Amino acid sequence: MDISSWFESIHVFLILLNGVFFRLAPLFFFLPFLNNGIISPSIRIPVIFLVASGLITSGKVDIGSSVFEHVYFLMFKEIIVGLLLSFCLSLPFWIFHAVGSIIDNQRGATLSSSIDPANGVDTSELAKFFNLFSAVVFLYSGGMVFILESIQLSYNICPLFSQCSFRVSNILTFLTLLASQAVILASPVMIVLLLSEVLLGVLSRFAPQMNAFSVSLTIKSLLAIFIIFICSSTIYFSKVQFFLGEHKFFTNLFVR
């Protein structure tokens, strides 16, 4: 092997490495157990390159002149595919984060909001708890294997350095699913809190000297924790596991 072919092999390897990197990088920015709050950037970037180097299949990728001519466009396409994949894999965590925010809003505890390092946003205590709960269940149920399967599926649907067509309209369906599932999962607690508000209102009407609403936060918090304890081992646990077996959220975003 002469020096020119050796440099060409290195050039091809670096292009493949960057292509895989741009698809994997959004995963490490969006997933709550891989982002800035958990893994520092100085460690995360080398880890992404290490994982990307293990996913390179140079023998199965056709590196032609068109790749070098449109390399920036193809890299941008890889970023879009990585973002769509990250959105789909982050769906259960976003849903449970929204569930915690809805419950805290209904029980009047949003004053305790603080900066969540795992998400980088102003979040409530229950939102952080549900986010960690979903991450634990996700990893306990084989979530890392599911992530690798999803990455493999993304390359089957949209191979490296090939053109893909996206269904932009299905992104609205994705957002609808996010909002609807959050409301559905929070509905048992919301119903109980609504009934407690009604009972406290009746009590305050007939016994105003008791000042029932001064203890409403405590009562609603106890009721919310009780309902969450009942639902956590059945509804919430099974819902996270349900998303582990669903690849359709990602596949529906592409025209095949």
UniProtKB/Swiss-Prot annotation:
It is a multi-pass membrane protein. It holds the Pfam family Bac_export_1. Its main location: membrane. It comes from Shigella sonnei. The chain crosses the membrane at residues 13-33, 37-57, 79-99, 129-149, 183-203, 217-237. This is Surface presentation of antigens protein SpaR. The keyword Nucleus does not apply. Required for surface presentation of invasion plasmid antigens. Could play a role in preserving the translocation competence of the ipa antigens. Required for invasion and for secretion of the three ipa proteins. One of its GO terms (biological process) is protein targeting. Keywords: Cell membrane, Membrane, Plasmid, Transmembrane, Transmembrane helix, Virulence. It comes from the Bacteria. InterPro entries: T3SS_IM_R, T3SS_SpaR/YscT.
